[in-house]
């Protein structure tokens, strides 16, 4: 199964990629991830607070990684053809490489925000690896029915992650500074809503039931990716919650703390 991945580099040409209707969404995703990376880099240049620096480093790395993976898909290096149902079906495996690195970084942002213990962080990262890994196995599986078995395992791992965010992390956030609690709740809600949509898109897309065509699936994943990475970062890095208590600047019209959301 995994031997399919090198074939993608050799067997898919630039002409084949640009001739696909999803090409425009990959180009847009590449541009938005690149712009997000540059914005976070510039915004973080004048930051001196040690706590804020950690958040800037992690949060900037997220769209930077996504940019490289979207670029690889755009140029045809992140695509493979998987035979099932009597057809050759295009699967963008680079999407999973993106998620494998970026999703634990997003979880690390949330964990640092609420000062989570190391054991909880390791458990979340482990569950995240299972979530992404089994999703990739499902996407590359040639037996159609087995795809949904792997999807179910991946979704179960995601539900565990969201459970920890909604219950374990929320109780920790509520005992912290008001700006930390309010920012965490906004980011928690954004993460829960967006991450919950991923298995739905997977299920109806080319990896699953094939209800929607690949170009629509690519559009949906691109919107989710940009929102979950760049959108997440914009909320986090505009909040005073990332600064140490002594360093937190006064809120302004453009840089206020995130609004409280339950």
Swiss-Prot record:
Molecular function per GO: light-driven active monoatomic ion transmembrane transporter activity; monoatomic ion channel activity; photoreceptor activity
Q: What role does it play? A: Light-driven proton pump.
Membrane topology, as annotated: Multi-pass membrane protein
Q: Which residues lie on this side of the membrane: Extracellular?
A: 14-22, 76-92, 141-147, 205-216
Q: Is this entry keyworded Acetylation?
A: no
Q: How is it modified after translation?
A: The covalent binding of retinal to the apoprotein, bacterioopsin, generates bacteriorhodopsin.
Which Gene Ontology cellular-component terms appear in the entry? plasma membrane
Site feature (Primary proton acceptor) residues: 98
Q: Which Pfam families match?
A: Bac_rhodopsin (PF01036)
- Excised during maturation, the propeptide residues are 1-13
Q: Which residues carry this modification: Pyrrolidone carboxylic acid?
A: 14
The main place the protein resides is: membrane
> What does the UniProt entry say about where the protein is found?
Cell membrane
Kindly list the biological process annotations in GO that this record carries: phototransduction; proton transmembrane transport
- Name positions with the PTM N6-(retinylidene)lysine: 229
Its protein name is Bacteriorhodopsin
User: Which intervals lie on the Cytoplasmic side per UniProt?
Assistant: 43-56, 110-120, 168-185, 237-262
Transmembrane portions of the chain? 23-42, 57-75, 93-109, 121-140, 148-167, 186-204, 217-236
UniProt entry keywords in alphabetical sequence = Cell membrane, Chromophore, Hydrogen ion transport, Ion transport, Membrane, Photoreceptor protein, Pyrrolidone carboxylic acid, Receptor, Retinal protein, Sensory transduction, Transmembrane, Transmembrane helix, Transport
Similarity field: Belongs to the archaeal/bacterial/fungal opsin family.
């Amino acid at each position: 199964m995994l031997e399919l991945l090198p074939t993608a580099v050799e067997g898919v040409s630039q002409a084949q990629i640009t001739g696909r209707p999803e090409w425009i969404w990959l180009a847009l995703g590449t541009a938005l991830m690149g712009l997000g990376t540059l914005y976070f880099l510039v915004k973080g240049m004048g930051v001196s607070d040690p706590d804020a620096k950690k958040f800037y480093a992690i949060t900037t790395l997220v769209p930077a990684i996504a940019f490289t993976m979207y670029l690889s898909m755009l140029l045809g290096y992140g695509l493979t053809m998987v035979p099932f149902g009597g057809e050759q079906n295009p699967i963008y495996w680079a999407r999973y490489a993106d998620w494998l690195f970026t999703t634990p970084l997003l979880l690390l942002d949330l964990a640092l925000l609420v000062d989570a213990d190391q054991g909880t962080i390791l458990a979340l990262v482990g569950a995240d690896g299972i979530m992404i890994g089994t999703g990739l196995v499902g996407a590359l599986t040639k037996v159609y029915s087995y795809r949904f078995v792997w999807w179910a395992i991946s979704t179960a791992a995601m539900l565990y992650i969201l459970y920890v965010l909604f219950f374990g992390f929320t109780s920790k956030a509520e005992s912290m500074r008001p700006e930390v609690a309010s920012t965490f709740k906004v980011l928690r809600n954004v993460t829960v809503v967006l991450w919950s949509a991923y298995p739905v898109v997977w299920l109806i897309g080319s990896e699953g039931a094939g209800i929607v065509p690949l170009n629509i699936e690519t559009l949906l994943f691109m919107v989710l990716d940009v929102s979950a990475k760049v959108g997440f970062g914009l909320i986090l890095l505009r909040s005073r919650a990332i600064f140490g208590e002594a360093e937190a600047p006064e809120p302004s019209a453009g840089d206020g703390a995130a609004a409280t959301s339950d």
